[in-house]
């Protein structure tokens, strides 16, 4: 599982890893938030209504879910279990709470936290995305500082200063984990 603060680069890193490793899969999560520019339903997220989210939650379709920043996000249970059953490595994009929950259910899960090079760089990235107003950026920045304080709950940390180097470091972790004696 890969976690990072908003603007930390986790989505871009995961997309690049998926292109480089054919055994890696990333089940598409569900969300109630509206799509951002260039996001497509079914590729980036399954964009659903709050009512649909509640229906699926009641039905047990989600492995875990959270509600950061007022919008709901969930990890699809069936897609993950199907991928694991086929021997695929699953990479998930989760917040700190979701990662902790999944680790309890899947003891062999590997938790990786992607750090920004600095808090100042993170603030600049959040502003540069132009997707949130200053109040929302402030909320995301505050949560990022809180989440970074939980770094000790993760197995690895990767600094995303140089994108190519961060991708290589993530690939190295995935490779090392395949050969780890458990």
Which positions does each model-derived feature cover?
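Walker A/P-loop
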Residues: 11
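The feature captures the helix immediately C-terminal to the Walker
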Residues: 14-15
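Conserved phosphate-donor/acceptor-positioning beta-strand/loop module used by diverse small-molecule
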Residues: 90-95, 104-129
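NTP-dependent small-molecule kinase module
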Residues: 124, 128-132, 146-182
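ATP-binding Walker
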Residues: 7-8
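Hydrophobic anchor at the beta1->P-loop junction of P-loop NTPases
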Residues: 2
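ATP-dependent small-molecule kinase phosphotransfer cores
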Residues: 29-90, 97-100
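Post-Walker A helix-loop "phosphate-sensing" segment adjacent to the P-loop in P-loop NTPases
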Residues: 18-27
């Amino acid at each position: 599982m890969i976690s990072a603060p908003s603007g930390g680069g986790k989505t871009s890193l995961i997309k690049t890893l998926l292109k480089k490793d054919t055994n890696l899969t990333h089940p598409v999560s569900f969300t109630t938030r509206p799509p951002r520019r260039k996001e497509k339903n079914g590729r980036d997220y399954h964009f659903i209504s709050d009512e649909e989210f509640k229906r699926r939650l009641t039905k047990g379709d989600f492995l875990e879910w959270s509600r950061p920043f007022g919008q709901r996000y969930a990890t699809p249970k069936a897609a993950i279990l199907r991928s694991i059953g086929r021997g695929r490595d699953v990479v998930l994009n989760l917040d700190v709470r979701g990662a902790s929950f999944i680790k309890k259910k899947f003891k062999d899960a590997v938790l990786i936290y992607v750090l920004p090079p600095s808090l100042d760089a993170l603030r600049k990235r959040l502003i540069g995305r132009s997707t949130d107003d200053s109040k929302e950026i402030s909320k995301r920045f505050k949560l990022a500082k809180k989440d970074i304080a939980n770094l000790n709950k993760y197995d690895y940390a990767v600094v995303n200063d140089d994108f190519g180097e961060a991708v290589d470091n993530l690939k190295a972790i995935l490779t090392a984990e395949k050969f780890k004696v458990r």
